[in-house]
Design a protein with these regions (language model features):
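Hydrophobic/small residue at the entry helix of a nucleotide-binding pocket
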Residues: 153
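NAD(P)H dinucleotide-binding glycine-rich loop of Rossmann-like/cofactor-binding domains
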Residues: 87-148
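Glycine-rich beta-strand-centered segment in the early N-terminal region that forms part
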Residues: 23-40, 52-93
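Glycine-rich phosphate-binding loop and adjacent beta-alpha segment
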Residues: 172, 220-291, 323-325
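Adenosine-nucleotide cofactor-binding segment
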Residues: 162-221, 271-275
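NAD(P)H cofactor-binding loop motif with strongest signal on the N-terminal glycine-rich segment
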Residues: 148-149, 217
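C-terminal capping/lid region of NAD(P)-dependent oxidoreductase domains
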Residues: 288-294, 305-325
Length: 325
């Protein structure tokens, strides 16, 4: 049996992405067959395609997030039945119409959760969750600085931090994105194309600084963040959209008793009980509209190159999804 897949034979520009028919693997006893309805595009897909993140074995199917319906289950599968709604992330090769996966690498959705919203929020929502609860536990009255605040993770990070009671400062690259970030809940918004974000953070916090800086930009912002970090604060790096971070002198942190942390969502999906609970908590907030998910645009399967270009050129505000229905 065949399925359409997004595939690369080498890492490089958007034109390395190919739409091809590939074989569906034979189902093992602990695996399920999923019919995907929606795919979620994330910046990790850009990094894996362009070589910023190395892929050990090529050629390979790509993609890291999708939602759909269970079509078939292996004889030893306990958690799912045919017809269940599911979502999953951090499984390389997810950009296929049909996908075979171990039952412990996906989570069940409640019936009140829309599959489109699930594909638009699983990876980014769970990322925002571990960032605000594990990498740094955001507290009431914290000053939180979020780079790329109008992007998918940035929007959810803002809303989650506001639910907790933090003051949120967001950075963006243009005035349109500034309006998006402001409408999404940022207390202050900085356009870093014409303002120095470090000095503006000091101004907005009465020279206190940010308790935590969430940085998915990397090279262009990371070291400058040290200038506006509060005492005992933390910079959390979880992406490198502008390039790899230059080496820094860790002694610069010592006068502030500050710290640096990194984060990766994969670690928080390895224990299925934790993975399922975290997803349930996220989607409860989404269902209750306490966290609102903005979908920027839908593409069809054959438009994957266009979707990559739009995300890589930072033209998107919110989530780009691929519609397979």
């Amino acid at each position: 049996m065949k399925t359409k897949s997004i595939r690369i034979y080498e890492q490089g520009s958007y034109d390395v992405l190919k739409v091809e028919e590939t074989n569906i693997p034979i189902l093992k006893s602990n695996e399920v067959l999923i019919k995907h309805h929606y795919l979620g595009l994330n910046y990790i897909d850009i990094n894996q395609r362009n070589g910023s993140y190395k892929i050990k074995e090529l050629p390979t199917n790509v993609g890291m997030e999708a939602s759909g319906i269970i079509e078939e289950v292996g004889k030893d599968v306990k958690r799912f039945k045919v017809g269940d709604k599911i979502t999953h992330c951090m499984n390389l090769g997810s950009f296929t119409e049909y996908f075979v996966l171990n039952e412990n690498r996906l989570v069940k959705l409640k019936n009140n959760i829309d599959l489109k919203l699930a594909a638009a929020s699983t990876l980014q929502g769970l990322t925002a969750q571990y960032l605000t609860q594990k990498s740094w536990e955001v507290k009431n009255q914290d000053y939180v600085l979020i780079h790329a605040a109008s992007g998918g993770v940035g929007q959810i990070l803002t809303q989650w931090s506001k639910i907790i009671g933090a003051t949120v400062i967001g950075t963006v690259g243009n005035d349109y994105k500034a309006s998006i970030a402001k409408n999404n809940g940022c207390d202050f918004v900085i356009n870093y194309s014409n303002e120095n974000f470090d000095s503006k953070v000091k101004e907005y916090t009465n020279n206190y600084g940010a308790d935590v800086i969430y940085d998915a930009v990397g090279k262009d912002t990371f070291e400058k963040g040290l200038n506006c970090l509060a005492k005992r604060g933390r910079i959390v790096s979880y992406g490198i959209s502008s390039g790899k971070i230059d080496p820094i002198d860790i002694n610069k942190l010592r006068p502030l008793s500050a710290s640096i942390a990194t984060g990766g969502l994969l670690e928080y999906t390895k224990n299925i009980d934790e993975y399922q609970k975290n997803a349930d908590d996220l989607f409860d907030l989404v269902h209750e509209s306490k966290i609102k998910i903005q979908i920027h645009k839908e593409y069809n399967f054959d438009e994957i190159q266009k979707a990559h270009i739009e995300l890589e050129q930072r033209k998107s505000v919110g989530k780009i999804i691929i519609n397979l229905r």
